[in-house]
């Protein structure tokens, strides 16, 4: 796909690494290993594979450079109860973001991460419906925000000149549980 984009447009300037899946919240010993493996494959390997392909293109194009924006999660900062695989996957994305920032520097490739909390998407339907597990064992409906706020934040990150970078940005529903999660 990267080659097709570069052929059509002459280069690749931005990658928004946005693939991700989650799982039903439960203690780790109750989770299916195949489901955990699938989550890691999508959330971690998906980011690696896309970043690798785009990095190569950005490194070899003239003028050299570009921007990679990884979709993290507030779970990369503060875990949600029963979400060990998802939390671990988003910590891996944070590690990738930091490494790409360093590795990309000589090639004018900037890398940043947006950590999103409770944007209203298909993935967060339960938050405003039946609720999600809380640290105290209860279920609670959590506030969500319009996904357009995420879109405008990503657009801001993407529109900066390569001499500037938003390394990490957190955009979340203002009233969502965050510190101490639940």
Locate predicted features.
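C-terminal helical subdomain
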Residues: 113-114, 133-180
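Active-site loop immediately N-terminal to the catalytic Tyr-X3-Lys motif
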Residues: 78-84, 142
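Residue(s) in the substrate-gating loop at a strand-loop-helix junction
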Residues: 73
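Conserved amphipathic alpha-helix within the SDR
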Residues: 1-10
């Amino acid at each position: 796909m990267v080659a097709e984009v570069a052929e059509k447009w002459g280069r690749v300037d931005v990658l928004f690494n946005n693939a991700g899946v989650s799982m039903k919240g439960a203690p780790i010993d109750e989770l299916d290993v195949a489901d955990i493996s699938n989550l890691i494959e999508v959330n971690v390997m998906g980011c690696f594979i896309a970043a690798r392909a785009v990095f190569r293109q950005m490194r070899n194009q003239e003028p050299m450079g570009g921007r990679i924006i990884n979709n993290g999660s507030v779970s990369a900062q503060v875990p949600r109860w029963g979400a060990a695989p998802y939390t671990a996957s988003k910590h891996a994305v944070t590690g990738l973001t930091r490494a790409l920032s360093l590795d990309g520097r000589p090639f004018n490739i900037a890398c940043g991460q947006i950590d999103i909390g409770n944007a209203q998407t298909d993935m967060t339907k339960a938050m405003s419906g039946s609720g999600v597990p809380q640290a105290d064992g209860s279920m609670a409906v959590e506030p969500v925000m319009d996904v357009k706020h995420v879109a405008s934040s990503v657009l801001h990150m993407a529109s900066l000149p390569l001499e500037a970078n938003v390394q990490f940005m957190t955009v979340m529903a203002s009233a969502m549980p965050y510190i101490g999660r639940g």
